[in-house]
């Protein structure tokens, strides 16, 4: 059976809304229009306007309302039309949702999911293309999820909705329409569990979200050069499955990290720091990080392509670590 990422997300929300009447969806265009990307399609008809709530164009307003509802015991799913617009709600996410459980000594929970497309799409320019993975991963109190496949989107969304504290669920606009094979029943997937998509012996490639597609293509190309790559899909950025990464590096002795976001203070830099500390003696070459260029993402199609990680960038990085000599 195949379903799209869009259908996987909708099915997860539908199942949890049927299972728990405290779950509701709120955001711009989520009800009558059925979501800017049709992720909430059919939910208004099934659950009504008290549980699928259209809002004015004020992320600060509806995010704050949803955080308050979570403090009161409800389970909001907040859809941002893009995580770029979530900057308007940053105070509620960081200072209220993320911190209150700790500041209350564990007395107040905040079971809320903030979800929507993150990062580049196709020529939507700098103010609609920023990747916020590293930004949210930096904040204590937030769990950060960035899946690739339809099965992982659904399984991790089920887990996110059931979590008693805030989850940042980072989707990708381009992936919404992609179809994947899925089992008949998709169970909740625990956080902090990465997945080895391909076992290998020469080099470990670590990535997440839509960059998994890039890495899969490159792994197949490099097979022709007799470079045997092990590919890890992180799925959850925070908490991070450090054990899987370290065990893989101990086997392959080389590491390349791929992310769409910027290099400085990025996800790749954090992973590299952990591996240098925990598995330094196993490395036969310096760690390579393939990332987006240090510029606001351009609108022009040729410049947008140059600013993003490419297959050639990844191939070059893998060959660099595999052919490294002192």
From Swiss-Prot:
The protein, known as: Pyruvate dehydrogenase E1 component subunit beta
Keyword field: Oxidoreductase, Pyruvate, Thiamine pyrophosphate
Record text on subunit structure and interactions: Heterodimer of an alpha and a beta chain.
Signal peptide range: none
Described purpose of this protein according to its UniProt entry: The pyruvate dehydrogenase complex catalyzes the overall conversion of pyruvate to acetyl-CoA and CO(2). It contains multiple copies of three enzymatic components: pyruvate dehydrogenase (E1), dihydrolipoamide acetyltransferase (E2) and lipoamide dehydrogenase (E3).
Catalytic class of the enzyme: oxidoreductase
Gene: pdhB
Any single biological process term in GO: pyruvate decarboxylation to acetyl-CoA
Binding site for thiamine diphosphate: 59
Cofactor: thiamine diphosphate
Recorded catalytic activity of this chain's protein: N(6)-[(R)-lipoyl]-L-lysyl-[protein] + pyruvate + H(+) = N(6)-[(R)-S(8)-acetyldihydrolipoyl]-L-lysyl-[protein] + CO2
EC number: 1.2.4.1
Listed GO MF terms: pyruvate dehydrogenase (acetyl-transferring) activity
């Amino acid at each position: 059976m195949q379903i799209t990422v869009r259908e996987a997300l909708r099915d997860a929300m539908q199942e949890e809304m049927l299972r728990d009447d405290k779950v509701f969806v709120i955001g711009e265009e989520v009800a009558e229009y059925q979501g800017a990307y049709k992720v909430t399609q059919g939910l208004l008809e099934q659950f009504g306007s008290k549980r699928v709530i259209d809002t004015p164009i004020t992320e600060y307003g509806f995010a704050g309302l949803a955080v308050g509802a979570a403090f009161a015991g409800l389970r909001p799913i907040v859809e941002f039309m893009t995580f770029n617009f979530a900057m308007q709600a940053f105070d509620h996410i960081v200072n209220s949702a993320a911190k209150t459980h700790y500041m209350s000594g564990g007395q107040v929970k905040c079971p809320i999911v903030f979800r929507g497309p993150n990062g580049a799409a196709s020529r939507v320019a700098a103010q609609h293309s920023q990747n916020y993975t590293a930004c949210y991963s930096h904040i204590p109190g937030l769990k950060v999820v960035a899946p690739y496949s339809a099965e992982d989107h659904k399984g991790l969304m089920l887990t996110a909705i059931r979590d008693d504290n805030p989850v940042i669920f980072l989707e990708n606009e381009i992936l919404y329409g992609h179809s994947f094979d899925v089992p008949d029943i998709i169970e909740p997937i625990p956080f902090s569990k990465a997945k080895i998509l391909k076992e290998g012996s020469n080099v470990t490639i670590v990535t997440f979200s839509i960059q998994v597609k890039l890495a899969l293509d490159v792994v197949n190309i490099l097979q022709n050069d007799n470079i045997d790559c092990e590919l890890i899909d992180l799925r959850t950025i925070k908490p991070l499955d450090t054990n899987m990464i370290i065990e893989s590096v101990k086997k392959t002795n080389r590491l390349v990290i791929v992310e769409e976001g910027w290099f400085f203070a990025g996800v790749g830099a954090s992973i590299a720091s952990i591996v240098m500390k925990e598995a330094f003696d196993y490395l036969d070459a310096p760690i390579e990080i393939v990332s987006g260029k240090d510029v606001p993402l351009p609108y022009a199609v040729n410049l947008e392509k140059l600013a993003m990680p490419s297959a050639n960038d990844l191939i070059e990085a893998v060959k660099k670590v595999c052919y490294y000599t002192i």
